[in-house]
Amino acid sequence: MIVPIRHQETLANLNFPHAQAAEFLKNSEAKFFYFLSPQRREKDRLEARARMFFYGGEDPATGSAAGCAASWMVQHGIANSDEQVLIRQGVEIRRPSEMYVRATRDGERVTNVRVGGYAVELLRGTVTI
């Protein structure tokens, strides 16, 4: 479920009620909450901050939710069709991530949703079963 937040300071200071959220989600088709705060920056660049809470934790980068957010922003006129949007996530948990998203509007439909970014290897190992 995409939850728009007007002010990025509010998003940064969000105290997520995990137990209440789990109860709400049980009666919903949504699986998680993706909090999104889009803001226009200089030169009309659209950037957003996001937070994704799940199972008592927080994800530093959620590409699948970022793609849905791109579609949502285009559908609701926040982002223009094919406009690249930078989504920053994971800042509050000291694992900052940047994802670049865009989506195309085709009449009333949103299509061609794209998510990209860079990744770094955090761990390498072998598991023996």
Name every feature range the model reports, one short phrase each.
Residues 1-129:
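Active-site proximal loop and beta-alpha junction motif in alpha/beta enzyme cores
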